[in-house]
Amino acid sequence: MEKKYILYFLFLLPFFMILVIAETEEENPDDLIQLTVTRNKIMTAQYECYQKIMQDPIQQTEGIYCNRTWDGWLCWNDVAAGTESMQHCPDYFQDFDPSEKVTKICDQDGNWFRHPESNRTWTNYTQCNINTHEKVQTALNLFYLTIIGHGLSIASLLISLGIFFYFKSLSCQRITLHKNLFFSFVCNSIVTIIHLTAVANNQALVATNPVSCKVFQFIHLYLMGCNYFWMLCEGIYLHTLIVVAVFAEKQHLMWYYFLGWGFPLIPACIHAVARRLYYNDNCWISSDTHLLYIIHGPICAALLVNLFFLLNIVRVLITKLKVTHQAESNLYMKAVRATLILVPLLGIEFVLIPWRPEGKIAEEVYDYIMHILVHYQGLLVSTIYCFFNGEVQAILRRNWNQYKIQFGNSFSHSDALRSASYTVSTISDGAGYSHDYPSEHLNGKSIHDMENIVIKPEKLYD
């Protein structure tokens, strides 16, 4: 019997092992995917290193030097004796910071440094993850800051669009441009949230590299371009209205639609073709390629044009204020106010702060400032151009007052009806059931008249 049970156990053991392995894979699919990605990166780097070692010319300079080598993670060139070679940390592991440095020492004898404990050649990777915890915390803070910013932007922009569409008296060309700009902000915010939560952080999706992932990246880049080109449309409209022709007739909005929604398709399509041919990485998610300038170049050009429009508009405003002979302080305050209102709409802050500073604290401050400027721009624009708009405030105030008056009248009317009905009902009940009344007439009306009044109480107000 025992032998029989042992045979059953041996027969079922492989199935139990399969179940355990499958359960482990279901519990930690991301770990297995990350391990596969890391292994592929290391194998690719190793292959490229050996190719480089064989193809590079032999060192011709005199003197002692350490030979080129592969240390298991990185490739090292020939180095003169007594020097220290340095390069950036690899991105194989999640806790490695590619901005930190790896060092490898070549001693005076032309041998790579050996660790005293293991007596093996050793490369110093200790700096790669020394500040990982702090940087991960900063990255998480920026991630949550981004999600909250886009969420608030979507909510405020949808409310603004609802106001613009509901109140027909606000309809004009300027509001039409605002509607399209706000809608582009909404689309861009929604796609950005999906990209950050469902694509960028989904290693399984990136590893499988479906076509839908690349299509989504194409849509993401296209909508980002639409966002900035609708900013350009706002700048062109304001410049035409204030500088070119103040008393001109209505402008043709068809060209604005083409520029805002149509033109961004051109760089987006060119980038997609170039990415497919020259840098076809998974989901086109990598930013380590100059092909992104196909998208960023037109955006920077649009922002520079908007910067010119802004400066010219401020110049015209200052000139007009000087003609009115107002006080100097008031003149500059109005010019500054106009500038501060235009800056968030036209996106000039990306031109004013284009360079990332060096230094840990400076970089962190820069990241927070840029994340606020970029991801809260929809909230800022909707606040300034809708909620702080005098016309919008006047219409909302007028409708709110009308609603309060109507609600108050309705409430007072219903209270009066209930009070009158209660009074008349009491009188009717007394007349019908009391034997103490000297006459069947009350207040000049008969009991039958009172019954009619109870049935039709609105007659009290005739």
UniProtKB/Swiss-Prot annotation:
**Tissue-by-tissue expression:** Detected in lung and coronary artery.
Q: Which UniProt keywords apply?
A: Cell membrane, Disulfide bond, G-protein coupled receptor, Glycoprotein, Membrane, Phosphoprotein, Receptor, Signal, Transducer, Transmembrane, Transmembrane helix
- Give the organism, scientific name: Sus scrofa (Pig)
Stated family: Belongs to the G-protein coupled receptor 2 family.
Topology in membrane: Multi-pass membrane protein
Instruction: Give any single GO term for biological process.
Output: adrenomedullin receptor signaling pathway
Task: Please state the protein's primary subcellular location.
Answer: membrane
Q: Which PROSITE patterns match?
A: G_PROTEIN_RECEP_F2_1, G_PROTEIN_RECEP_F2_2, G_PROTEIN_RECEP_F2_3, G_PROTEIN_RECEP_F2_4
- Quote the subcellular location field of this record: Cell membrane
Give the site residues for Required for ADM interaction: 203
Its function, per the record, reads: G protein-coupled receptor which specificity is determined by its interaction with receptor-activity-modifying proteins (RAMPs). Together with RAMP1, form the receptor complex for calcitonin-gene-related peptides CALCA/CGRP1 and CALCB/CGRP2. Together with RAMP2 or RAMP3, function as receptor complexes for adrenomedullin (ADM and ADM2). Ligand binding causes a conformation change that triggers signaling via guanine nucleotide-binding proteins (G proteins) and modulates the activity of downstream effectors. Activates cAMP-dependent pathway.
Q: Which parts of this chain are annotated as the region Required for RAMP3 interaction? A: 289-290
Spell out the disulfide connections.
Answer: 49-75, 66-106, 89-128
Regions of this protein lying in the Cytoplasmic compartment: 166-176, 240-253, 316-330, 389-462
- Tell whether NAD is among the UniProt keywords: no
Q: What is the recorded name of this protein? A: Calcitonin gene-related peptide type 1 receptor
**Which residue positions carry a glycan here?**
67, 119, 124
Q: Which GO terms describe its molecular function?
A: adrenomedullin receptor activity; calcitonin gene-related peptide receptor activity; calcitonin receptor activity
PANTHER family in the cross-refs: CALCITONIN GENE-RELATED PEPTIDE TYPE 1 RECEPTOR, PDF RECEPTOR-LIKE PROTEIN-RELATED
Gene3D superfamilies reported in the protein's UniProt record:
GPCR, family 2, extracellular hormone receptor domain (4.10.1240.10), Rhodopsin 7-helix transmembrane proteins (1.20.1070.10)
- List residues, modification Phosphoserine: 421, 446
Q: Which gene encodes it?
A: CALCRL
Q: How does it assemble?
A: Heterodimer of CALCRL and RAMP1; the receptor complex functions as CGRP receptor. Heterodimer of CALCRL and RAMP2 or CALCRL and RAMP3; the complexes function as adrenomedullin receptor.
Q: Spell out the residues of the site Required for RAMP2 interaction.
A: 289
- The feature of type site (Required for RAMP3 interaction) is located at 251
Parts of the chain on the Extracellular side? 23-140, 200-210, 275-290, 353-367
